[in-house]
Amino acid sequence: MCIRDSILAEAGFRPIVIERGGRVEKRTCDVQKFWESGILNPKSNVQFGEGGAGTFSDGKLNTSVKDPSGRNRLVLETFVRFGADPSILYDNKPHIGTDVLSEVIVNMREFLVDRGATFVFDTCVNNLDIVSQKLLSVYTDSDSNSNSEIKTDVCVLALGHSARDTFDMLYNKGFDMECKSFAVGFRVEHPQRMIDESQYGIQKKIILPPSPYKVTSNFPNGRGVYSFCMCPGGYVVNSSSTKNHTVVNGMSYHDRNSKNANSAIIVSVSPKDFGADDALAGVRFQEKLETENYKRGNGLIPQQLFGDFCDDRLTTAYGDFGSCTKGNTVFAKLNGLMNADMEQSFKLGMEHFGHLIHGFDRKDAILSGMETRTSSPLRIKRDESFESNISGVYPCGEGAGYAGGITSAAIDGIKVAEAIIKKYRPDFK
């Protein structure tokens, strides 16, 4: 959300950015250690830390958000300003890559510090002082200073979608929240060469980049099945942030040079699947899947070939290609993680996509479990001024339920910054 904070700083505000994880330099070391050893730091990982979950992703910057006001362009120009390749300004499917994005984030932070912003790392918001539906203070907790108070009447909640303890705190504080639909599934790998041949043709020229794809299907049972966060030349990564939970995601570097393409193939779920309708029902649904997934792999990424998945059989060896992962893997049965209706929809989706991309439903396509954090399972409600039912608190971005990626989250952050400026600095143009 540095773009949001940049706008506030330029309007004369001095934002305090509270980050529960570490600086990106330290965070990168923590993540690499986890991938190599399996030792998870719950405070600094693929989900938590400077830059959020997007830091360890493909770094996609395309968005379906229609924004004629130019905020989308501002987001791209800001990334270029701080070190991204200028090609993102004209590329139809712009992406930064996790290696470049990490450098951009540091440049953004240093710029903001020079303009009066304060960054507080390895610190979690654990309470809010609210009187008569108005914010008075924010309380934080860190290893060096527990229950520290920051007096303020303005707080932007840019949580990310994995801050479940914070969701609990907000729910218990009386924030108006609701559960919402999202999607879960498996990360699926294919040889990048196969995808290139299907998308470009057999005589793919070397000047062409690794090909992306986007596939979607809807079925009579009301479920949608579609690709999400497709990573050409990428890696499947263990993106767990909670002990005894296993979650996967996709990531690629700027040059997208791994041998495999991967994407989450996910199945839509709605509140009727959760068995409850309170705001945290979707969170509990995710946790149930992630803990069972952890058990299947004993903390490693559980994998199964698609053909074996269809036959309900344990995989014992890869087929014609191996897996490109960050994090250790183990063969395990993924059958039964999703309910029967969802599992059947996943299989039908894969078969349908095989008609769109030759070989997509090949028997040795590699499934990794599970992809559960495609978007926030809840929404923190806000009014037309972007405030929640608690005056001074502004829910923002993906975790609050108003975005679905780097660019859309940045656009939402800009909107929130504009609302704050309008209320507190109406003279600023």
Question: How would you describe each model-predicted region?
Answer:
Residues 3-429:
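Residues forming the flavin
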